[in-house]
């Protein structure tokens, strides 16, 4: 009993001390100090923060959630929505106003308003920022430099950003961006830049030099990168290696002994398969060191063709060509386990599968190339006219995805059923006489659309795809297309060359078949550099269908050649 009374008296004396502390703790959790979260990273989705705005009654806390939501919306490429949220804010606390200033500067940089972004940064007291806010401050500096294509200044800003970042994933993302910047720089810039005592910059420059100097010899590249790690053991990139370079640790040079070529060589698609095979065979030439087993996918199910290739001991499959057959592999990738596969088509189901790449003459490549070309030509408000079809949907999506990456905004996409529809949609908005990317299925469509635009007085610069380019086009067509720019494979640059004449005779001058022939020729090249293509970032091959590199999911991307109609002739452009 005595012990119990003593405990009761002790608790009674302790409560006056603990109670204020408990209240103080509650204030930190529920009171005005909630806005301290602005000093930290925003790790949730914009949807999460938007829901919190609706659930919260305190105006001050609502505004904090709006700032967090706007911050994430910018990272989700939803700048307009972020600006709309910021416009709702009133009577901010000093901490909220500080966070908004950083966000306003970032939005200005995203919109390429460098002067406004720089002016806003000057109003921000850098010494008062948390580590998270400091990283965001330097991200704005980096974006301003990136807008000016000042690679080294952008890298310097991101090095400062790296020093402030604490989250591992954010550090990895930033390291990957530094690496992408340096990889985009030419060798002269990298080799002549002086680090001026900046040890981190010196490490990045040496890493880039090691990569550039050994890119043509991938077997030596892995060792060069390991030597760099030994030289810079404390460098941030030594702890978190650029994601692109991680696959090089287990790189082995491509060795091809036996190839299974899976093509439709009978039935309705035989003309496609036989043309690709001709290109493949001619590229192979007299090289008999590699055995090629040709399998007709029209004569047996593709599953049986794969089983036959395995039975033959083929280590690599080139093909299949038809999309349905590619989907068969995608639905059961274990069927090709242990084999390299260069599929000659892609489907909406395509995804990253170990030792599998996708190569074809996809219209998406042309759409992405058009976005790049128009951006480099100074176009900022493109109109994209595409047919209301699968081709139109795919090209419009590919163009817009690339345009969002370049301009942080959507392209103006307009669909048409008939050429007359396209002409009407384009002439109905004369204020947009800037530049139009027109996707057509043949030259007659382009003739109709351009004729209507000319008659209506629209003076927009016209870009288009390769399907307008046909051997059947007479000089009258080429004159009518004066000034039109289009993309196509580089093979068509030399119409007087011996190789062109040979293929022209073999295909009857049909440009569609000539493109397939070139694809077959390039598939031989790709097969012999398969590991390099998959594992060495930036590795490229100069083929008949373009400069070939591996994109996401090992989808082979083609850097196309641009041509222009000038004085009745087709002139290659730089």
From Swiss-Prot:
**Gene3D superfamilies per record:** 1.25.40.650, 3.40.50.2300, Tetratricopeptide repeat domain
Q: Entry's PROSITE patterns?
A: PROKAR_LIPOPROTEIN (PS51257)
Q: Name where it's found.
A: Cell outer membrane
Q: Name one GO molecular function term.
A: enzyme regulator activity
A single GO BP annotation from the record? regulation of cell shape
Q: How does it sit in the membrane?
A: Lipid-anchor
Gene Ontology CC, one term: periplasmic side of cell outer membrane
Show the SUPFAM superfamilies listed in the entry: Periplasmic binding protein-like I
Any Pfam family: LppC
Q: Which UniProt keywords apply?
A: Cell outer membrane, Cell shape, Lipoprotein, Membrane, Palmitate, Peptidoglycan synthesis, Signal
Q: Where is the lipid attached (S-diacylglycerol cysteine)?
A: 26
Q: Which InterPro entries match?
A: LpoA (IPR007443), Peripla_BP_I (IPR028082), TPR-like_helical_dom_sf (IPR011990)
Could you say which residues form the signal peptide? 1-25
What does it do? Answer: Regulator of peptidoglycan synthesis that is essential for the function of penicillin-binding protein 1A (PBP1a).
PANTHER family the record matches: PENICILLIN-BINDING PROTEIN ACTIVATOR LPOA
Task: Outline the subunit composition.
Answer: Interacts with PBP1a.
Q: Which family does it belong to?
A: Belongs to the LpoA family.
Q: What is this protein called?
A: Penicillin-binding protein activator LpoA
Q: Which organism is it from?
A: Mannheimia succiniciproducens (strain KCTC 0769BP / MBEL55E)
Organismal lineage:
Bacteria, Pseudomonadati, Pseudomonadota, Gammaproteobacteria, Pasteurellales
The encoding gene is lpoA
């Amino acid at each position: 009993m005595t012990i119990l009374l003593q405990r009761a008296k002790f608790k009674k004396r302790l409560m006056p001390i603990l109670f204020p502390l408990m209240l103080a703790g509650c204030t930190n959790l529920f009171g005005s100090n909630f806005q301290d979260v602005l000093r930290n990273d925003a790790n949730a989705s914009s949807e999460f923060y938007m829901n919190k705005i609706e659930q919260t009654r305190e105006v001050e806390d609502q505004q904090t959630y709006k700032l967090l939501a706007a911050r994430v919306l910018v990272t989700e490429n939803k700048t307009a929505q972020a600006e709309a949220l910021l416009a709702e804010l009133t009577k901010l606390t000093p901490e909220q106003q500080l966070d908004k200033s950083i966000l306003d500067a970032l939005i200005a940089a995203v919109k390429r308003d460098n002067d406004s972004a720089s002016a806003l940064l000057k109003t921000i007291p850098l010494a008062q920022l948390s580590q998270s806010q400091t990283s965001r401050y330097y991200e704005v500096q980096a974006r301003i430099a990136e807008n000016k294509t000042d690679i080294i200044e952008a890298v310097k800003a991101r090095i400062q950003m790296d020093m402030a970042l604490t989250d591992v994933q954010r550090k990895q993302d930033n390291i990957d961006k530094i690496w992408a910047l340096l990889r985009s720089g030419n060798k002269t810039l990298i080799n002549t830049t002086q680090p001026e005592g900046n040890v981190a910059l010196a490490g990045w420059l040496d890493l880039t030099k090691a990569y550039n100097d050994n890119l043509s010899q991938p077997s030596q590249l892995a060792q060069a990168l390991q030597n760099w790690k030994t030289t810079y053991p404390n460098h941030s990139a030594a702890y978190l290696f650029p994601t692109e370079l991680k696959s090089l640790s287990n790189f082995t040079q491509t060795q091809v002994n036996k190839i299974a070529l899976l093509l439709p060589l009978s039935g309705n698609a035989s003309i496609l398969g036989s043309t690709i095979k001709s290109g493949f065979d001619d590229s192979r030439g007299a090289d008999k060191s590699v055995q090629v087993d040709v399998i007709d996918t029209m004569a047996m199910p593709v599953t049986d063709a794969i089983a036959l290739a395995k039975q033959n001991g083929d280590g690599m499959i080139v093909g299949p060509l038809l999309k349905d057959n590619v989907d068969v592999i995608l639905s059961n990738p274990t069927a090709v386990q242990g084999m390299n596969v260069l599929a000659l088509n892609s489907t909406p189901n395509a995804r990253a599968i170990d030792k599998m790449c996708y190569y074809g003459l996809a219209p998406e490549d042309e759409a992405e190339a058009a976005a790049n070309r128009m951006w480099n030509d100074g176009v900022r408000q493109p109109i994209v006219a595409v047919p209301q079809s699968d081709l139109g949907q795919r090209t419009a999506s590919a163009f817009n995805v690339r345009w969002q990456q370049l301009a942080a905004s959507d392209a103006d996409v307009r669909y048409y059923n008939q050429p007359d529809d396209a002409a009407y949609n384009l002439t109905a908005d004369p204020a947009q006489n800037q530049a139009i990317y027109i996707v057509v299925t043949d030259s007659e469509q382009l003739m109709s659309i351009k004729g209507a635009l000319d008659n209506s007085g629209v003076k927009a610069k016209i870009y288009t795809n390769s399907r307008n380019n046909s051997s059947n086009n007479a000089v009258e067509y080429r004159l009518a297309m004066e000034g039109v720019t289009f993309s196509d494979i580089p093979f068509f640059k030399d119409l007087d060359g011996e190789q062109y004449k040979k293929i022209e005779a073999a295909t009857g001058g049909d440009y569609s078949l000539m493109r397939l022939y070139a694809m077959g020729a390039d598939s031989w090249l790709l097969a012999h550099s398969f590991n390099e293509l998959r594992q060495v970032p930036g590795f490229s091959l100069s083929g008949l269908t373009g400069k070939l590199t591996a994109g996401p999911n090992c989808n082979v991307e083609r850097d196309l050649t641009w041509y222009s109609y000038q004085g009745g002739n087709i002139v290659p452009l730089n």
